[in-house]
Structure formats: C-alpha cells, structure tokens
Amino acid sequence: FEFILSNGDEFSFELSKADMVKTASFKGSEENLHFYEYQKYLTTIGDKYQAINNELAAAKTKADTAAVNKKSKDLSNEMKEYRNNFVKKYPSSFTAVVFNALSEPEVPEKDPMLPDGKTKDSTYRYRTFKGEYWNRFNFTDDRIIYTPLYEKKLEDYFKLLVPVPDSINKEADFILGKTKNSPDLFKYSLWWITRFAETSKVMGMDESFVYLVENYYQKGLATWLADSSLEKYIDRAKKIAPNMVGQPAIDVRLPDIDGNMHTLSSTYPTADYTLLVFWSPTCGHCQKEIPRVDSMQRIISKKVNFKIFAVETDQEDEKWVKLIKDNDLNKNWIHVHDPQHTSNFRATYDVYSTPVMYLIDKNGKIVGKKLDHSNIEGLIDFLEKKKKQDAEKKTK
C-alpha cells in the first residue's frame, strides 16, 4: 500500500484489506485523493491489458496479432492522454511531478528526409529524443529523489549518450546546473554521475571522473562530504589524472634480469604501438592472461610494428624467469622489474592489482587503457583506420 507523505502532513485514511486500492479513502490529504484517483484508474487499465494479453495468446493469424497489437497501442495512448489531462487538472500535485518525470519525447517512427529530398536525416530521431528528454522534468522538486524515477531517468539518459568524456562532461554540467538550487537533487545528481564515471567499463571514462572532482568537489560544491571523504575523491583523481587516455606516458626506467637498463621512452619511438604491461608471476589471472597477450601480439605484429614493455611487480625473480621461459615470451617483449623499488610505477600508473595494461603510440601518447588480450587488436585496428581516414582528409 503506497501513499504520498510530505513533511508536516497530518491526515487519516481508511481501507479494506480485501481491495486496498478501490476502498482507500483519505481525509486531510488532497495529494493522496488525487494519487488514488490515478491508482483506481490503473486497476481498470490493468484489467484491460490482461484481456489484451489473453487475446494475443489466442491469436492465430498475423491479422489477429496486428489487431491485438493495435488495441495495446491504443490503450497505451489512452494512458498517456490520462496522465496529460491529470497534469493539467492538478498541476501542483506531486503525482503531476511524477507524471512529467515519466514522460518521454514523442518522435516519428521513421527518419524524415533532409532538404535535398533524397537523403534520410538519420540522426533526427536521436537529436529530438535527446533534446526534449528533460523538457517536462521538474529540477526544482527535491521529492523526486525519494522515488525510483530519477535514478532510472539518469540511467536511461546516460546510456543514450555517446560514451566519450566530452559528451558526458557537457551533460553533467547541464544537469548539475539545473539542480544547483535544489540541494537534495544536486547532491544526488553529483553522486550518481560521479559513480557512473568512476565505475564505467568504457575506456577513457575516468577523464569524466577527474573532471567532476576538479570542477565540483575541489571547488567546495560537495558541501555534505566530510573532509576525509572529500580528500579520498581528490586523491583518487590525482592518481588517475597523469595516466588518462590522451596524456603523455610517464617514463619508466628499470633493469632486466641481467641488470641491463631499459626505458619506456626509448622503446615506443621504435614501434607503432607499445603495450605497457604490469604483471606478477604469482597472480593467477596473470598466469592465464600473459600467454594470451603473447598470442595476440604475434597476430598484431603481422599488421604493425608492435612491442611489449612488461614490468614484473612483485620481485618473484625465479617464478618470473620460469614463466617467461615456459611461454617463450621473448619476441617483441622487453622484460624488466624493480628490485630496488625506485620507479614508483604503482602510483604513476595506478597499479593496485594485476595485470594492468596501457597502449602507447609512437609519439608516447597513451591511446588505450583498461585493456586485456581480447580488445587490444580491435583498438589498434580502430586507431589505424582513423589514421588512414585522417590522412585521406588532408589530401582532399
């Protein structure tokens, strides 16, 4: 049994357990009277949908199915019309706020034609949907965060966006700007978008996390956080910032097992791409992943000049050498370790578990991270294709 409760409300209600929705009555709460007007309507709609589902199950021909689907679409439109009329009738009610939050832009089923009359405007529906997505959402009513609606609205919207930092940062600024005068909505929005950026599996999205920390947390806008919690965000951003995609790779200078020194900065200019790998021979996942990386590099090396700069992280020299020998990890590999703990690679490259991999181009720029054997070849193919396209544009 659900009802709407705001601070300071005093009201009473009566109902029968036999049918709580149909028998619910309220005294002293116009809000809930309106809400249960809708709940009772939903009961009748539910009965109609059940009848439609039964008809669909019994449909024998395409014509039967099409007729039932039309009934379902008509009923959906009836619900939209009911909600729109409800909003007009009770515009100040919280239920109206909810209905507005639930609404989605209406876009044509097919893409319209461009002015030339020959080409479809293939992004029109996307642009329209995205551009009108928040039109009816009330960014000034903090109560909405106590429903599941706002989180779902954010999830759907950020899934809709192109997952690149510039796009995410722009939309984060838009939403946080809209909620800046609504403390609870702002707090929830900043928390949600920060978590989205920090936990994203999409390569490069950590740039958005750093952006949020630098532009909101460090500027004192997360006023609800204790100093210790705020410092954790700032510290995490500082560790990520130097190794984001697009940043120059910080040099690593370490010896191999024979004491010969090798530097990352002298390696990447000699290859089209260099894979910087941090791994441990005692790590179970590394024991499986590193041989797979070698298989992958043998394929990639037929396409481009490819090298691997592999840093052993745990000073397990005997196991390290054995794993290299057993898996023939020699061609295109440079193996180094840090027996004197002089390189500070864990902080520089955010290495707190293994394996960790970065892809570095010929100019020393980080072009990939959060990698494994399954996606490195695809990333290089993409980068090579982009280089070719950019070169063709320059010649035109």
Language model features with spans:
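Start-of-domain marker
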Residues: 1-9, 159-162, 176-180, 185, ...
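Non-catalytic, surface beta->alpha helical segment in thiol-disulfide oxidoreductase systems
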Residues: 1-3, 353-356, 362-396
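A non-transmembrane, solvent-exposed segment enriched in polar/low-complexity residues
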Residues: 1-91, 101-102, 106-133, 140
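N-proximal helix/coil linker or "cap" segments that precede and/or mark the start of modular domains
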Residues: 199-255, 267-271, 318, 322-325, ...
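Short active-site neighborhood of thiol/selenol oxidoreductases, capturing the structured segment around
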Residues: 263-293, 307-309
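Short, internal strand/loop/helix patches
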Residues: 321-358, 362
